[in-house]
A protein has these predicted regions:
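Terminal, low-structured helical/coil segments at or just beyond the last alpha-helical repeat
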Residues: 11-15, 137-191
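Alpha-helical segment of the N-proximal tetratricopeptide repeat
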Residues: 23-60, 70
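Start-of-helix register in tetratricopeptide repeats
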Residues: 28, 66, 100, 140-142
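Residue-level recognition of tetratricopeptide repeat
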Residues: 35, 39, 73, 107, ...
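Register position in tetratricopeptide repeats
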Residues: 39-43, 77, 111-112, 151-153, ...
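Conserved structural position within tetratricopeptide repeats
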Residues: 55-59, 89-93, 126-127, 133-134, ...
Length: 191
């Protein structure tokens, strides 16, 4: 007599760690210089100088997601999508990435027609951001990004808000932001 057993396998969300990265003060001083310059000047030379500051920060602390994310943002703003994609891909390989930056990586991948990789990044972003929302349910920024990641993961071009009345109750002081954001088409972020 042969007895076979089958187990129930439930689909579990991937385990994500949203513990904030420990700040290295020496690296952070370069990051803060980059941020100050980035906020005060928008020319190409200043942007390049910001990137050099971020490179110095990364040389000291190669696991801080913000250093990679801001560097990728600056590179993409300069039209250097391949370089931005390389930076965020490296961050992902080092596990120096957050839900926000996984979303950024997905956008960069989609812009380079890497749709399978983008789909995976949006799914990972969604999982990270849902974990953030469990711990910080009042974070509108994480909520909006999670909904955008979900829309792009599900290949929809409608930004969230299935129950708009409930969302308005959840964020009563942010109604203008909600109304402006819900009109964004997630696929327009890729093009």
């Amino acid at each position: 007599m042969i007895i076979t057993t089958t187990g129930c396998h439930s689909r579990q969300e991937p385990k994500v760690d949203i513990t904030p990265h420990h700040i290295n003060l020496q690296a952070d001083s370069f990051y803060q210089q980059a941020m100050t310059l980035m906020e005060s000047s928008y020319d190409v030379d200043s942007t390049r100088k910001c990137i050099r500051f971020l490179d110095k920060a990364l040389a000291i602390d190669s696991l801080n997601p913000d250093y990679y994310g801001i560097k990728a943002k600056l590179l993409s703003e300069m039209g250097e999508l391949d370089s931005a994609l390389h930076v965020q891909t490296l961050a992902m390989k080092k596990k120096a990435i957050t839900g926000e930056y996984l979303f950024q990586l997905g956008l960069l991948q989609a812009a380079k027609d890497m749709y399978t990789e983008a789909h995976e990044s949006f799914g990972q972003s969604r999982a990270f951001l849902q974990a953030v929302l469990k711990q910080y349910p009042d974070s509108l920024g994480a909520f909006i990004l999670a909904e955008a990641a979900n829309a792009l993961y599900e290949k929809e071009d409608s930004l969230f808000m299935r129950d708009i009345d409930e969302i308005r109750k959840r964020f009563p002081e942010r109604l203008m932001e909600i109304e402006m954001t819900r009109r964004v088409k997630p696929h327009s972020l890729v093009n």
